[in-house]
Amino acid sequence: MNKSKIIKISAGVIGTLFLCFCTFTGIRAYQIKNYTEAEPLDLNQSYDLQNFLLNHYSEEYEILRPLSYTIPEPKLNVWAESAILIDTANGTVLYSKNADEVIPPASMTKLFSMYVVEEEVSAGNLSYDQIIPLPPESWACNMPPHSSLMFLGEGQRVTLEELLLGLSICSGNDAAYALAYTICGTMEAFVERMNQVAADLGLVHTHFVESSGYSELNTTTAREMAAFCRVYLEKHPDSLSRYHSVQKFTYPKEENLASGDRIAAQDFSQGFPKHITMPITQRNTNPLIGVLDGVDGLKTGYIDESGYNLSLTARRNGTRYLSVTMKGPGNNSKEGQAGRVHDGTELMEWAFSSFADFNTEMYVHPYFIKAFGSSKKGFNIVPAVSEKILSVPYITGSTMEENLSQIKVYLNYIDNGWGEIKLGDVCGNIKITLDGYTLQTIPLVADRSLKAANIFVKMADFIILMLK
């Protein structure tokens, strides 16, 4: 075979290969152009992404988290020894004072009891209109001295909903015992359930020995109680209107009395009888219900060792804040209630006048990125945060609305991916500013790993990029 023939054959082969390459490049360019969304993650990929975010951005996935920016130290006059204030929409801690001091929760313990009960209702194991048997351990006459009571007695007919009302409004220790024995048969077994709730939420200082809050051996901190309350409100928001915001409760009524009993006045000066027949109306122990704008929960607590405690929440214009104050001062209940009113008002009014919620949902979502020189044609970059509400400080404008209108959101991310992509690679960010002040910078990370393509695909993709 002569030299010219070899050259012609070689040229033909090269031309054919070049034509094939051009055709491949054209087809790939067309495919990439029309590729507008990434393939859904499979279960393993979803698990890997979740694991990565939890490991590398763990603070963003805690129940409570610090502000993403600094503010001047607030000049608040909080009387309680320990306190915390959070935005329930995102768990942001707006204010704290000795929030990690371990203190008995007293009757705030009952919130954990209510949580366990609500979980049983949600699971279909109990219903609100269900009649609950009252063991002797739950009768008012068998409660420890100075217990708060809803006045349960032998033979009474009481529904689950009435017990929850008695627990939340009257802070009835007898109601706490009745619920514990109904659900688990013994106080010890019910307390195990409560402690498991605390453990599941990562509350390391929260521990219970009984369900009413009477014992000083029950322990928690303001921070951990706030974290629990946030979860409680997220999972059972109806409990606020159904129980915690109700201003008064009368028990027992005619329909609650034991067979043969009739409504009649009684003298309790010598102790409580087994059969209680006198209706007693009690007001909600929370002194800010119906007093401070927006307040609709949650729970007071007092024993000598704890001082005057209060878990408080209020909602105005769609924004909800929650405070926990513990070891409040007071030589008597009147002084203790005055302290609760003072601290609750101080914290809530400061929160509503100093912050507002800004919804970032229209920005905090996955963004599609085309991939060149990779095994797949694209992937998503996702925000490394779970919350879509930002607590915004009031720093500019004559009104909070004007303040919010000055927020600017900047999206900054790569145009295209190239070659190997690793799960979690930072590919950009979302920057939220107010009046030139950065409030939050959210990393945008790759939601999956992609292998690098072979040399021919890389060459084709390089040409496609050059011609864009």
Where are the model-predicted features located?
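Domain-terminus/edge residues, biased toward the C-terminal soluble/receptor-binding domains
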Residues: 29, 203-204, 216-220, 224-468
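Active-site-adjacent loops and short helices of periplasmic peptidoglycan-processing enzymes
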Residues: 3, 29-235
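Hydrophobic alpha-helical segments and their boundary regions
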Residues: 12-15, 80, 102, 144, ...
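N-terminal Sec-pathway targeting helices
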Residues: 1-18
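Hydrophobic alpha-helical membrane-insertion segments, chiefly the h-region
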Residues: 17-28
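General helical structural elements
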Residues: 7-12, 32, 37, 303
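Intrinsic disorder/low-complexity segments
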Residues: 12, 81, 199, 259, ...
